[in-house]
Amino acid sequence: MKILIFIIASFMLIGVECKEGYPMGRNGCKIPCAINDNICKVECQAKWKQSDGYCYSWGLSCYCTNLLEDAEVWDSSNNKCVG
């Protein structure tokens, strides 16, 4: 029985995914970048210590990975960008 519980728990852990998204600046807009991953990595880690970041070339904006579920990221449905 313990083995069965262990196997089920293992499958649940394998499927765990972290939140991802665009970090927002003070004005509510995405943080712009131009092919420089270091800037984005610094921005993401300044807001969320455990995160990683890179410059998403298609959108020319920083993109953060490994975020906590309650992390506030830019969302097109409730865009508050004023810049």
UniProtKB/Swiss-Prot annotation:
Disulfide bridges in this chain: C29-C81, C33-C55, C40-C62, C44-C64
Segments forming domain LCN-type CS-alpha/beta: 19-82
Signal peptide: 1-18
InterPro entries, per the entry: LCN-type_CS_alpha_beta_dom, Scorpion_toxin-like_sf, Scorpion_toxinL, Scorpion_toxinL/defensin
GO CC annotations on file: extracellular region
Subcellular location: Secreted
Molecular functions (GO terms): sodium channel inhibitor activity; toxin activity
Main location group: secreted
Comment block on domains: Has the structural arrangement of an alpha-helix connected to antiparallel beta-sheets by disulfide bonds (CS-alpha/beta).
Family as reported in the entry's similarity comment: Belongs to the long (4 C-C) scorpion toxin superfamily. Sodium channel inhibitor family. Beta subfamily.
Function: Beta toxins bind voltage-independently at site-4 of sodium channels (Nav) and shift the voltage of activation toward more negative potentials thereby affecting sodium channel activation and promoting spontaneous and repetitive firing.
Name of the featured protein: Putative beta-neurotoxin RjAa15f
